[in-house]
Amino acid sequence: MKAAVLYEVGKKLEIIDLNIGKPKQGEVLVNMKAAGVCASDHHVIHGQIPYPTPIVLGHENAGVVEEIGENVQGIQPGDSVIMSFVSSCGNCVYCRTGLANHCSRHYSDPEVQHKLFDNTFRIHDQEDTGIFQMNKLGGFAEKQVVPADSLLVIPNEVPPEVAALIGCCVTTGFGGIVNLDNIKTGSTVAVFGCGGVGLNILEGAKSLNANKIIAVDISDHKLEFAYKFGATHVVNCLLYTSPSPRDRTRSRMPSSA
């Protein structure tokens, strides 16, 4: 299969042929259909997030199940799936107490975080060098073996290029605000930064019936999108030095930012 591999920080991704193994217990082989390019991928490429190399990036993914390993339940070949960028082992204290997003085995070590849970590789290059998978996923590839617990089955009719974004920017943004307990009906919310995550925070604020939703960014293009995602007011901070964007939003009484 082909994949885009980062061999060295600061260098371009290399599209090369890789060998891929069979899914083991609790794992699934997925044909990747779409992968979002997240800011985190750029941070890794430029060394702003220390990840091991060589590595296949991509953690906003959608695909179709090709093969399942032993003891995989609720997933069948042919299922359309999206992926969580935080894999959970199901056995550590966090996973057992409903805090799987803090899985200690996933975050225990940078190298372990980007291998499968048995601490081995499923993909190798032609020199048999093991290739890391970003967050045990690695969507910048034609196929990947991933933990079954990272997958969520979705309706087949959902376009993969739409579904892929749910894996990070939607869950991070929308989930981040709807899981707060201080956003009530009628609240005023200010969102600083209207990238993929910020836009989904706006949508989450709208779903919580916030009264005023103020979007702050330096890009008019992003602020135009902000209106579509629920913003009632926008502020381009490059246009205001006095009062500052902070004071300008305060004048509209934000209860959360």
Language model regions located:
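Residues that mark the start of a beta-strand
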Residues: 2, 27-29, 188
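Cysteine-cluster motifs in flexible loop/terminal segments that predominantly coordinate metals
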Residues: 87-143, 148
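Hydrophobic alpha-helical segments, chiefly the membrane-spanning helices
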Residues: 253-257
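Glycine-rich beta-strand-centered segment in the early N-terminal region that forms part
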Residues: 21-35, 45-96, 100-101, 109, ...
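Mid-domain Rossmann-like dinucleotide-binding core that forms the NAD(H)/NADP(H) cofactor-binding site
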Residues: 80, 142, 149-151, 155-239
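Cytochrome P450 core scaffold surrounding the K-helix E-X-X-R motif
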Residues: 40-42
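Extracellular beta-rich ligand/substrate-recognition surface
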Residues: 6-12
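Conserved small/polar residues in nucleotide/adenosyl-binding loops
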Residues: 240-249
